[in-house]
Amino acid sequence: MSVYRLFTVSIMDMCVLKANCKDPLGFTVEYTCVFGISSPIPGLHGGEHVNSYGEGVCVITFHNKDGRVFWFIIEKLPKKYTYPISPRFTPQDASEFCGRLADVHVFNDVTVGHLWRNRTVVSMNALEEGLLSTWSFERMVLLGDSVHKMTPNIGQGANTAIEDAAALASLIHQMINPMTPQNASKAAIGHLFQKFQDLRMSRVQSTVQRAHFGARFHTRDDHLKALVGRYIFPYVGNLVMARTVKVIGGGHKIEFLPPPKRSMPWTAQTDHSQHKMHGSKVLWAYLSHPDQHWSDDPRGTAQLRSQSLGTHRTSTVGRTLFIELVIVMIDVVYARQDIGEDVNAGVKDMAVQSRNSMRFLPYVLSYGSTESLLAAGWRQVWVFRLLSYLFGALLGL
């Protein structure tokens, strides 16, 4: 638990706080993580990011431009803990943990053993998860991990804390701005803190839910997640990345400072309708040109590699049909997590996404039939691609 949150809660208790404070210890632990930094490893290239999914364990790596590898190995614990009861780990625990998983593949021939042997920094911690309903008391306010904690699977823990700070700074600046002076009384400050929580709660709740789902999806927590993670996600990495970027783009910024110049403009300045591609369109493009990278935004993509342990990309009719049909489920899973701000940023609701996915089913069948001909010996690939374009045009893709 954060020292600051513990201190605030103790003051609340001493003052016999009458406000709603039902969850002062509301964090749970279901996963553990070994975090490390390693020197460059052959096969893991700078600027790339790898997600490797397995049974009960996943490996996430980020590689900087100099080749250094930042990595997380996340494993589900045998039991669930509720704070303040939480497991603690030593360097010896981390060594035994990585030794037990040394042969687990990260990407191609790279294994956990390579990460461990090249380590320069390593630590092992329990991963707390949760979102508290009370963020402030009188003139004290909490933000970041002190009120919302998540696993690192979607990489938004620190970003969410930074967004908290930006939103709070903007509200404080608004209060003390000489052009619009406001009374900084105890009541006014309490109102400001409540406004801050109300402003952030919806987005933070969505982010915590996405991280919660991500941890369980990456570790194949049930049969459905295992099915999609093993046979679908290795083929739609850019689609996932594009949607993730769209969600991140809706973050709160410091309102009284101009946005820095970047290659990508701020979300509020971007017309998403100019470069929107639905999931079915991305797959159609991928199937027509499997050697290309595809993204929602034509201005460029990052290199993301997704690997499901034990999966090999063999071109079969059954695999193709299966991948195309399950895209309906992928759209629905993402749409179920949409909130108001996502819709405003250009993410369609579940009904529209499902309808667009179902429109894609006729093309699925046509593609499968065409690949059957190819498998039977009809090797004129240009004919296959012509048919792909034709069916795509007929369906308005």
From Swiss-Prot:
Sequence positions that bind FAD: D145, A158
Effect of a null allele: Impairs the synthesis of terretonin but accumulates dimethylorsellinate through the decomposition of an unstable intermediate.
Entry-linked Pfam families: FAD_binding_3 (PF01494)
Record key words, sorted: FAD, Flavoprotein, Monooxygenase, NADP, Oxidoreductase
Coiled-coil annotated residue ranges, if any: none
Gene3D superfamilies: FAD/NAD(P)-binding domain
EC number: 1.-.-.-
Enzyme kind, highest EC tier: oxidoreductase
Pathway: Secondary metabolite biosynthesis; terpenoid biosynthesis
Xref: InterPro entries: FAD-bd, FAD/NAD-bd_sf, FAD_mOase_fung
Biological processes per GO annotation: terpenoid biosynthetic process
A GO molecular-function descriptor: monooxygenase activity
Residues annotated as the enzyme's active site: Y53
Cofactor: FAD
Function comment: FAD-dependent monooxygenase; part of the gene cluster that mediates the biosynthesis of terretonin, a fungal meroterpenoid that acts as a mycotoxin. The first step of the pathway is the synthesis of 3,5-dimethylorsellinic acid (DMOA) by the polyketide synthase trt4. DMOA is then prenylated into farnesyl-DMOA by the polyprenyl transferase trt2. Methylation by the methyltransferase trt5 then leads to farnesyl-DMOA methyl ester which is further subject to epoxidation by the FAD-dependent monooxygenase trt8 to yield epoxyfarnesyl-DMOA methyl ester.
Family: Belongs to the paxM FAD-dependent monooxygenase family.
Name of this chain's protein: FAD-dependent monooxygenase trt8
Source species: Aspergillus terreus (strain NIH 2624 / FGSC A1156)
